[in-house]
A protein has these predicted regions:
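Basic, Gly/Ser/Thr-rich N-terminal segments that form RNA-phosphate-binding interfaces in CRISPR RAMP
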Residues: 132, 215, 232
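Conserved SAM-binding motif I beta-strand of class I
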Residues: 169-173
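Conserved S-adenosyl-L-methionine
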Residues: 154-168, 190
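S-adenosyl-L-methionine
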Residues: 162, 175, 180-225
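Domain-level detector for long C-terminal conserved domains
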Residues: 229-235
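A generic, residue-level signal for flexible/boundary positions that often mark functional hotspots
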Residues: 101-102, 168, 182
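A general structural motif
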Residues: 133-135, 166, 192
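Class I S-adenosyl-L-methionine
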Residues: 2-160
Length: 235
């Protein structure tokens, strides 16, 4: 279990230094990470990539500390064959407990339920290693922070380390903040796909799309990229 207080304290301290309200803390951190791992970071050289990240880690030191803690926490979870949704935990603690859940109808799927649903759906041992699933799309049209997709990816990857990456994951949600969270979760776990911010009942024009892990850097790094495509403002 992660230390939520550690994250919340650092988030609130950085936003206070930036002159931003506490309510924006999680969104500001997500924006920071999306910039840190933007496709714009790669100019064709390892030095350019390192300089991009170093500049941003130094510009907001408290967010930099949190970024390193986040990467480490997710890495340790994946080493145990698990997925980790730090953003979802913080969102529930910082926002939904303050009454937003009852107003918006947002209730995040518990990890145990996500894992159970993934095991029921299951890709199956034979299917997970079969060429016929190459490029198969897995979609969640009310994805939130992406827990069901994370669970599916880890379940598939248990059978074959690279099996999860044969899937294309598509997440949709109408909440701009949780779309950011979902994009970062998919990126750091090594998934391929995109996150679409739109009303899936009305199939509205996406306000923004996140393309996950399109770039494969020609040097050793476990973390990939996010490309952001802006659309029409959400109505």
């Amino acid at each position: 279990m992660i230390n939520k207080k550690f994250y919340i304290d650092y988030l609130s301290q950085q936003t206070k230094e930036d002159g931003r309200p506490y309510e924006t803390a999680l969104s500001d951190f997500c924006d920071y990470l999306l910039d840190l791992f933007s496709v714009k970071a790669f100019d064709g050289t390892l030095d350019g990539f390192k300089n991009w990240q170093q500049q941003r880690l130094q510009a907001k030191p408290k967010f930099g500390v949190l970024a390193m803690a986040w990467l480490n926490d997710v890495s340790q979870a994946m080493d145990r064959g698990q997925w980790l949704d730090v953003f979802g935990m913080l969102y529930e603690d910082m926002y939904l407990t303050a009454g937003k859940a009852s107003k918006t109808g947002q209730f995040f799927t518990p990890q145990s339920v996500s894992d159970l649903m993934s095991s029921i759906i299951g890709s199956g041992k034979n299917e997970a290693t079969s060429a016929k699933i190459e490029g198969t799309t897995v979609n969640d049209c009310a994805a939130g922070s992406g827990r069901l997709l994370l669970a599916h990816f880890i379940e598939a990857s248990k059978l074959n380390h690279s099996a999860g990456r044969t899937f294309q994951y598509v997440a949709q949600d109408s909440d701009p903040l949780v779309c950011k969270m979902c994009a970062l979760n998919m990126m750091v776990h090594g998934m391929n796909g995109r996150v679409i911010c739109q009303d899936t009942l009305a199939m509205s024009t996406p306000s923004v799309e996140y393309f996950i892990n399109e770039v494969r850097y020609p040097f050793s790094t476990p973390y990939y990229s996010v490309r952001i495509k802006s659309g029409n403002p959400a109505k």
